[in-house]
Amino acid sequence: MFGEKFRDRQKPMVLVLGLGESGLAMARWCARHGCRLRAADTREVPPNLSALEAHGVDAQFVGGPFSPVLLEGVELVAISPGLSPLAADLLPLIAAAREQGIPVWGELEFFSQALKTLGESGYAPKVIAITGTNGKTTTTSLTGLLCERAGRKVAVAGNISPALLDKLSEAIDNTALPDVWVLELSSFQLETAHTFSPDAAVVLNITQDHLDWHGGLDAYAAAKGRIFGTQTVRVLNRDDSRVMKLAPSEDSEAGMVTFGVTEPKNEGDYGLLRDNGMIWLVEAHDRDASDEPAPKRRRKNEVATPPNIALKRLMPADALRIRGLHNAANALAAYALARAIGLPGASLLHGLREYRGEPHRVELIASIDGIDYVDDSKGTNVGATVAALDGLAQRVVLIAGGDGKGQDFEPLAAPVMRWCRAVMLIGRDAPQIRAALEDTGIAMTDHATLEEATRAAAALAQPGDAVLLSPACASFDMFKGYAHRAAVFRGTVEEIAAERGTMI
């Protein structure tokens, strides 16, 4: 379960850094397989320390600042995804580990090594992986549903929770290993993966996020690119220039499929067709092919738009239960991933129609007097809010602000100018958003609370508008998390509905 290095010897002494969900899962996994353990956390009493003891994990615990001294006797380092290798307190330890030839693995690498070991006994699942700045959870959940509708036994795990190794342990214990793994992966998880090679994977988009963790946008994009193995079918968003830089080289054996909100031009690609006021999900395919063409493995620079290409209409976008063009793109990505592992299209289309979406992700929570109230509290970065505005494609009173995480808010200007009637600003970094939007000519007002901002937005909105909570910021300056922020928004909307004689 730990690769060739440790195959024919005593199980390694493992240092687990960080006792969050993934750190706890790695500790349990290593203990399960007979490893000696040392667990370290900057907190003297981390919340999961009691859980570690409750699971009977025998580990030496060290609380306080990280130090290279922790490496004494250690043969393998297991690092939690929330810990940046560039952090001042961690960098010396990681550098020392590499100098000493000690591998540094994250949970995804443990998972990858475990699948290789299980493969020696004949276990050969399909593995689908999803990453991107925005849309990961929606696309992961939808892909899992599509695979189920195609009759496969599916496990969905990763950044979406539960932890990868917990899900794998459960499957092993229950003798219920799945046919397909569908994994939501963050850039943090991918940073410490070395041998991961899924059958199909997608990068949905790359916009500013977690730049402090990675050290810059280029490093962040490179981490996203680690999702692809040498033979992984790459599903890429052709509307995102940074994503398309991850296309395979001409001499690569990897296949490539693209998706986007534009019409596809190459065989096997997916997109949207606008015809007579309707928007269709479509696939580009050879006019001479069967109704169920095999997933296309296309080279990076293959000549576009051959003469026998036609657009096959899959379903109207209006038949999706998730709102917005960005969600239509997510649906295409999920469909492309499922097709890339050979699943039949007909059953997948039924799944697309069935999926209802995830909470707090452009979620319609009420329509009151002709005004939609939309919860996108999970929109914690600029790219998510841009996608929500462009995806809804209607007049909006936007509620934005919070902890901006050092982002550049300038990309908000164009969609705000196009779609917004007004912007309600909240939170610590409201002044930065105001500065970025000051030349748009859109009215902006500052509010001390989300409740106040929601009521002000409701007063300004007109029938046909949406009041959209899409903060473009993290929530921790005012709330316990994005779910708490969403609950406050929903509670205020419920009060507004009751005052107007409506129940939601």
UniProtKB/Swiss-Prot annotation:
Catalytic reaction list: UDP-N-acetyl-alpha-D-muramoyl-L-alanine + D-glutamate + ATP = UDP-N-acetyl-alpha-D-muramoyl-L-alanyl-D-glutamate + ADP + phosphate + H(+)
Keywords: ATP-binding, Cell cycle, Cell division, Cell shape, Cell wall biogenesis/degradation, Cytoplasm, Ligase, Nucleotide-binding, Peptidoglycan synthesis
E.C. code: 6.3.2.9
GO biological processes: cell division; cell wall organization; peptidoglycan biosynthetic process; regulation of cell shape
Compartments it resides in: Cytoplasm
GO molecular-function term, one example from the UniProt record: UDP-N-acetylmuramoylalanine-D-glutamate ligase activity
Region (Disordered) residue spans: 286-305
Regions of compositional bias (Basic and acidic residues) in chain numbering: 286-295
Pathway(s) it belongs to: Cell wall biogenesis; peptidoglycan biosynthesis
Domain of life: Bacteria
Binding-site list for ATP: G132, T133, N134, G135, K136, T137, T138
InterPro entries for the chain: Mur-like_cat_sf, Mur_ligase_C, Mur_ligase_C_dom_sf, Mur_ligase_cen, MurD
Gene Ontology, cellular component aspect: cytoplasm
Reported function: Cell wall formation. Catalyzes the addition of glutamate to the nucleotide precursor UDP-N-acetylmuramoyl-L-alanine (UMA).
Family the entry assigns: Belongs to the MurCDEF family.
Stored PANTHER family: UDP-N-ACETYLMURAMOYLALANINE--D-GLUTAMATE LIGASE
Stated name of the protein: UDP-N-acetylmuramoylalanine--D-glutamate ligase
Organism: Paraburkholderia xenovorans (strain LB400)
Taxonomic lineage: Bacteria, Pseudomonadati, Pseudomonadota, Betaproteobacteria, Burkholderiales
